[in-house]
Regions:
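N-terminal export and membrane-targeting signals
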Residues: 1-12
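C-terminal subdomain of the subtilisin-like protease fold in secreted/lumenal serine endopeptidases
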Residues: 5, 36-37, 116, 120, ...
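Protease zymogen maturation seam
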Residues: 7, 15-58, 72-73, 288-307
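Subtilisin-like serine protease catalytic core
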Residues: 32, 48-80, 88-134, 146-151, ...
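Active-site donor-binding loop signature of nucleotide-sugar glycosyltransferases
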Residues: 41, 86, 123, 204, ...
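Solvent-exposed coil/turn segments that connect beta secondary-structure elements
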Residues: 44, 65-66, 207, 228
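Substrate-binding/specificity loop regions of serine endopeptidase catalytic domains
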Residues: 129-135, 153-222, 229-254
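Active-site-adjacent mobile loop/cap segments within catalytic or ligand-binding domains
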Residues: 241-242, 258, 274
Length: 307
C-alpha cells in the first residue's frame, strides 16, 4: 500500500521572508507571517507574534520527506535522524515537503517554536509517496527513541489502514502528534492516520478566519490552524515559498505543542494533546462544517493577551 503526502498547493512564486531576531521580550515583528500573528491572540491580527518560550529544549520529529539541514533558517538545529526509504541516516530532502513542515513548526523566521531541535525521519520519496510498512517503521522508531520532551508532525494521509492507525496511536501515547485532516473537502474520518482520535487532527484556515476550501472536516478534526498561503523554508536554498494545505496547519500545531512542552516538560503527551484543544479559541471561525468543532489553535499565554 502506498501512502502519499497530504498535498499542499504551491503559490506561483518563491519568496524570501527574512525575520529580524526576536527581542528580549520575545516578540517577532517585521511583521511576522499571518499564521504566527493569528495564533497568539483570540481575534484578529496585530502584526506581532508573541511567544513565551523558544522551546530550545524540545525536539520536533518530522516524519515526512526529510529536512534540508543546510537551510540557514534552521541554524544548525537539525539533528541526525533516520532514513526508512533506503536505510541509514541520509535524511536530505528531495521533495521539499518535510523541510517546509519543519520550518513552519520550528524555523527562526517562519516557525512557531523558534529554537526547537529538529529530527527528520524520512519515509516519503521525491515524488511524495511512501510504502505503509516503511512509514510505520519510521513512526515506531520515534515511539521507541524519542528524546523527551518531544512532539511529532506527520504530513501524510491515505485510505483507512488499521496498522498505520495503531502505530500513530502508540506514538501519541509518548509524544503529542499533529496530523493533517486532509484536503479532499470531505469527512476526515475516512482516512488514516487522520482518523486516530488520540492524535491532533488539524484542519486549515485562512487569514480571514475562514476554513480552507479544501480542508477535510468531521468529528475527528480536533482543531483548525493557519494553512492557507503560509510561508516556510524552501529546500535547496536560503529562501522560502508559500504553500497551502492541512499539512501547514498541522505544522503550526506541532510548533505550539513544542511551546507547551517547553513550559510544562513533565506533562504527559495525552495531557498536552488535551491542553491544546482546551486552549483553542472557540467559535471564531466561519465556514465550519456541521458536526465539526469550531476551534482555532492558540499559543500558551494567549489568554493573557486577549485580542
Amino acid at each position: 500500500m502506498i501512502i502519499r503526502l497530504v498535498r499542499v498547493m504551491a503559490a506561483l512564486a518563491l519568496l524570501v521572508f527574512a525575520a529580524q531576531p526576536a527581542s528580549a521580550t520575545e516578540v517577532q515583528q517585521n511583521p511576522p507571517n499571518w499564521g504566527l500573528d493569528r495564533i497568539d491572540q483570540r481575534t484578529g491580527l496585530d502584526q506581532l507574534y508573541h511567544y513565551d518560550t523558544d522551546a530550545k529544549d524540545v525536539t520536533v520529529y518530522v516524519i515526512d520527506s526529510g529536512v534540508d539541514a543546510a537551510h540557514p533558517d534552521f541554524g544548525g538545529r537539525v539533528k541526525p535522524g533516520k532514513d526508512f526509504l533506503n536505510g541509514g541516516t541520509d535524511t536530505s530532502d528531495t521533495n521539499g515537503h518535510g523541510t517546509y513542515l519543519a520550518g513552519v513548526a520550528a524555523s527562526k523566521s517562519y516557525g512557531v517554536a523558534k529554537a526547537a531541535q529538529i529530527v527528520p525521519v524520512r519515509v516519503i520519496d521525491a515524488q511524495g509517496g511512501g510504502a505503509t510498512d516503511k512509514i510505520i517503521a519510521g513512526i515506531d522508531w520515534v515511539t521507541q527513541n524519542a528524546h523527551q520532551p518531544a512532539v511529532a508532525v506527520l504530513g501524510i494521509g491515505g485510505t483507512a489502514n488499521d496498522q498505520l492507525d495503531a502505530a500513530v496511536r502508540a506514538l501519541a501515547a509518548v509524544v503529542p502528534v499533529a496530523l493533517p485532516a486532509g484536503g479532499e473537502a470531505t469527512d476526515a474520518g475516512q482516512f488514516s492516520p487522520g482518523r486516530v482520535t488520540e492524535a491532533l487532527t488539524v484542519g486549515s484556515t485562512d487569514a480571514s478566519d475562514q476554513v480552507g476550501s479544501t480542508s477535510n472536516y468531521g468529528e475527528v478534526v480536533d482543531l483548525f490552524a493557519p494553512g492557507v498561503d503560509v510561508p516556510g523554508p524552501n529546500a535547496g536554498g536560503s529562501g522560502g515559498r508559500m504553500l497551502s494545505g492541512t499539512s501547514s496547519a498541522a505544522a503550526h500545531v506541532a510548533g505550539v505543542a513544542a511551546l507547551y512542552r517547553a513550559l510544562h516538560p513533565d506533562v504527559a503527551a495525552p495531557d498536552v494533546t488535551k491542553a491544546l484543544v482546551d486552549l483553542a479559541a472557540v467559535d471564531v471561525l466561519t465556514g465550519v462544517h456541521q458536526g465539526t468543532a469550531n476551534r482555532l489553535l492558540q499559543t500558551p499565554g494567549t489568554q493573557l493577551r486577549r485580542g
